[in-house]
């Protein structure tokens, strides 16, 4: 027993020394105990799943740490990998090999500590428990003990008050306003509400040769290491309602693809050029991080472009990977990603307790983002509108997996504020995902203090004259869908027409491009659009600049005057024109943008170019044609706003947009009306002829009333009439019937049935067989006469 204890102690000491874990003040040997957990949602998933999973969806572990027992509640990180996840490496011949492994199962989890309100965890269960967890401000690292068959683990306690050396700093490239870059993709039209929803960052990770060499054995060691880092980053960014998902990784196993030097700024410039010109052509992502294991003689541990997310050239960063602790490297990745999202360091006056906040300096894993960082991030979203983080890259089955605590209101739930430990909503019962007694709502623009606002309360004021104010319904906590004035509605005193909820004008576009009071230049400038070069054209077809036609001149390149140099990545051009006759000098300033999916230098679509005319893709066309109002009106019902066409604001009556369509529609209508009238006329003629025949029959029949017959009873809707008439045994059965129906009240409008009450018998009491034959006669003619009577 004694030798075994000595051996175990020596193993623990060697593990601590070999790992070189930074910032810990103590460790403790623990034996995590797995608790049974099989709930209804687990049973449902087992029945629905065709492929059994090695790793469970939900786990409970009990850990006795000191005098306290902690219950670790873990949920599998469903948003961990993107649908198009890929792995790239290089063989001995430096040939690139790319795989797309179908990862159906993994061992990475996130969670919290039960009964601890402020807690979090990022754990892998691949071979024992390995990762990070915290309780309030205290943070821990847990790892399995090497060579132990008893399930022994070491829990290291991070020292919150540990000194922070300068070698744990980072650097962000500083840009002046002049060089701040905004890609056109960022400013594409998105509703403001989109930026309040959940965001998604598709992260790509590149590991240099040094990182590969230190983690090449066992074969999947580097993969699990990078996955652990991304899982930690994802846990951190959930506080900002952001999911960080790994879309792929590339391993420079045969040598670095760029020059990595001690100057991190130079390394970042090399890396940004490589990822834009090489990596972007074969892989889509929102941000890429280079993990460098090269011992760089610099105090900086990472570098990033501030506010660079979604920019083709600058959405990248470099992070040093020299320490064995995955959580510390993951924390640095989260820090650099924060710079890319517009966050600055938590320096004075934005302070944060040591080691607590992601954007502060520190050598141990952080806990959360400071209020300053959150404010800076929200301001970045408002100003820059990074569009790439709005699309959801996760597999559909990941998004649809229902359970109480996933922060999504699934079927059968009234609310879902996340795990019990994370829920801060006073309206929702986090244990059952139902509203607390007496409450009617949880959140929304029409929900206040857990109660719905009254009907008619404005929940979304009109942002401008092309917008429409929305009001609460009184029965829904959500504000109705954001609606706007119909495209083409006059605005700004007739200077423009509404388009997609805005009133685009050239003055506003100039102010956006060049700021500083820039406005539209003289109309003579637009003659430059006939040149057909980069600074004067209407269409760009495969880098061939098509000059404008006369009618489209004011829909090509926009020309401005005043303002400053453009803040966008591109080339400015100013023409100085002189008009000798009018003795005026004109400045015509325009620009050509780089790295853009659409050219902001062209006059915006929807801008007025004449009475009833607007610009559309470099052409000046009729407003009705541009907005396709015919389709709009056909989809709308009276004054309703069509849900499928947010651009349509419907008016009373049909909207005919083109004479050709109107004529076609009118022709069809006339043909239908004429055809109906012809059918009605023919029908009336036939009825008149039959009516005259019935009159003649009654005249013939009036001379033969001496014969007595059976009693007929005719049923009508409102009254009964009984009379005795003979039923002839010859070919004239209709005469009597017609005469009988002659006395039908004028209110009678439809034929009814006639029943026979009795039949005549001969003196012997035997019914006349001929009468039975008459009973079976066809009464169609009677019905015809009845209709005419």
UniProtKB/Swiss-Prot annotation:
Chain positions listed as propeptide in the UniProt record: 26-176
Gene Ontology CC entries for this record: apical part of cell; cell surface; plasma membrane
A Pfam family it matches: Disintegrin
Protein source organism: Rattus norvegicus
Listed PROSITE patterns: ADAM_MEPRO (PS50215), DISINTEGRIN_1 (PS00427), DISINTEGRIN_2 (PS50214)
Keyword Glycoprotein part of the UniProt annotation: yes
Location within or outside the cell: Membrane
Peptidase M12B domain ranges (all copies): 199-393
Chief place where the protein resides: membrane
TM ranges: 669-689
Entry keywords, A to Z: Disulfide bond, Glycoprotein, Membrane, Signal, Transmembrane, Transmembrane helix
Name of the protein described by the UniProt record: Disintegrin and metalloproteinase domain-containing protein 7
Self-association state and partner proteins as the record states: Interacts with ITM2B in sperm; the interaction increases following capacitation. Interacts with HSPA5 and CANX.
Cytoplasmic side: 690-789
Signal peptide: 1-25
InterPro entries linked: ADAM_Cys-rich, Disintegrin_CS, Disintegrin_dom, Disintegrin_dom_sf, MetalloPept_cat_dom_sf, Peptidase_M12B, Peptidase_M12B_N, Reprolysin_adamalysin
GO molecular function, one term: metalloendopeptidase activity
Segments on the Extracellular side according to the record's topology features: 177-668
Topology of the protein relative to the lipid bilayer: Single-pass type I membrane protein
Domain of life of the native organism: Eukaryota
């Amino acid at each position: 027993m004694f030798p075994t204890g000595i051996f175990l102690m020596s193993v623990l000491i060697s593990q601590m020394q070999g790992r070189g874990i930074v910032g810990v003040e103590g460790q403790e040997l623990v034996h995590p105990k797995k608790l049974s957990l099989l709930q209804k949602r687990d049973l449902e998933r087992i029945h629905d799943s065709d492929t059994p999973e090695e790793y469970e969806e939900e786990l409970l572990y009990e850990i006795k740490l000191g005098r306290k027992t902690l219950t670790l509640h873990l949920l599998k990180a469903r948003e961990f990998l993107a649908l198009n996840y890929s792995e790239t490496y290089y063989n001995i011949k430096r040939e690139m090999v790319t795989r797309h492994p179908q990862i159906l199962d993994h061992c990475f989890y996130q969670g919290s500590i039960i009964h601890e309100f402020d807690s979090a965890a990022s754990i892998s269960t691949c071979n024992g428990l390995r990762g990070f967890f915290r309780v309030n401000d205290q943070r821990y690292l847990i790892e399995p003990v090497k060579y132990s068959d008893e399930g022994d683990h070491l829990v290291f306690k991070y020292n919150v008050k540990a000194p922070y050396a300068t070698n744990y700093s980072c650097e962000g490239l500083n840009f002046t306003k002049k060089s701040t870059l905004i890609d056109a993709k960022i400013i594409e039209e998105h509703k403001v509400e989109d930026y309040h929803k959940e965001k998604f960052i598709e992260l790509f990770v590149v590991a240099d040769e040094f990182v590969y060499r230190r983690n090449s054995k066992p074969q999947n060691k580097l993969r699990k290491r990078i996955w652990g880092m991304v899982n930690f980053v994802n846990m951190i960014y959930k506080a900002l309602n952001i999911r960080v998902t790994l879309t792929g990784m590339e391993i420079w196993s045969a040598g670095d693809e760029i020059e990595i030097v001690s100057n991190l700024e130079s390394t970042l410039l090399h890396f940004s050029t490589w990822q834009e010109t090489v990596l972007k052509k074969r892989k889509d992502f929102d941000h890429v991080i280079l993990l460098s294991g090269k011992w760089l003689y610099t105090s900086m541990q990472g570098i990033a472009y501030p506010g660079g997310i979604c920019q083709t050239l600058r959405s990248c960063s470099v992070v040093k990977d020299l320490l064995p602790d995955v959580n510390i490297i993951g924390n640095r990745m989260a820090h650099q990603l924060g710079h890319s999202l517009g966050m600055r360091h938590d320096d004075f006056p934005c302070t944060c307790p040591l080691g607590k906040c992601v954007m502060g300096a520190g050598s141990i894993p952080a806990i959360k983002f400071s209020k300053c960082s959150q404010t800076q991030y929200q301001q970045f979203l408002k100003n820059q509108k990074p569009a790439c983080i709005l699309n959801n890259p996760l597999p559909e089955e990941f998004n649809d997996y229902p359970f109480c605590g996933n922060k999504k209101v699934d079927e059968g739930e009234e609310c879902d504020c996340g795990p019990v430990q994370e829920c801060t909503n006073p309206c929702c019962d986090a244990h059952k995902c139902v509203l607390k007694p007496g409450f009617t709502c949880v959140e929304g623009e029409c929900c206040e203090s857990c109660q719905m606002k009254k009907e008619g309360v404005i929940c979304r004021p009109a942002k401008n004259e092309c917008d429409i104010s929305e009001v609460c319904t009184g029965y829904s906590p959500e504000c109705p869908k954001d609606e706007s004035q119909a495209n083409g509605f006059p605005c700004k005193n007739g200077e423009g027409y509404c388009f997609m909820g805005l009133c685009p004008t050239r003055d506003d576009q100039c102010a956006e491009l060049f700021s500083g009071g820039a406005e539209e230049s003289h109309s003579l400038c637009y003659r430059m659009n006939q040149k057909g070069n980069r600074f004067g054209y209407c269409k760009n077809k495969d880098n061939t600049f098509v000059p404008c036609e006369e009618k489209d001149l004011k829909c090509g390149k926009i020309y401005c005057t005043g303002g400053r140099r453009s803040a966008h990545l591109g080339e400015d051009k100013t023409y100085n024109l002189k008009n000798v006759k009018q003795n005026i000098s004109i400045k015509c300033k325009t620009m050509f943008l780089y790295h853009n999916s659409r050219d902001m230098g062209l006059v915006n679509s929807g801008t007025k170019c004449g009475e009833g005319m607007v610009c559309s893709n470099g052409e000046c066309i009729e407003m009705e044609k541009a907005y396709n109002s015919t389709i709009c009106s056909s989809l709308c019902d009276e004054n309703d706003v069509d849900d499928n066409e947010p651009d349509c604001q419907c008016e009373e009556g049909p909207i005919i947009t083109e004479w050709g369509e109107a004529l076609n529609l009118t022709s069809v209508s006339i043909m239908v009306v004429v055809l109906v009238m012809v059918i009605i006329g023919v029908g009336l003629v036939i009825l008149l002829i039959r009516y005259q025949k019935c009159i003649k029959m009654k005249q013939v029949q009036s001379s033969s009333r001496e014969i007595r017959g059976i009693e007929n009873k005719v049923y009508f809707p409102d009254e009964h009439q009984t009379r005795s008439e003979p039923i002839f045994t010859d070919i004239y059965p209709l005469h009597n019937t017609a005469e009988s129906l002659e006395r039908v009240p004028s209110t009678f409008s439809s034929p009814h049935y006639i029943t026979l009450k009795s039949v005549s018998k001969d003196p012997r009491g035997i019914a006349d067989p001929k009468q039975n034959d008459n009973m079976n006669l066809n009464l169609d003619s009677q019905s015809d006469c009845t209709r005419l009577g």
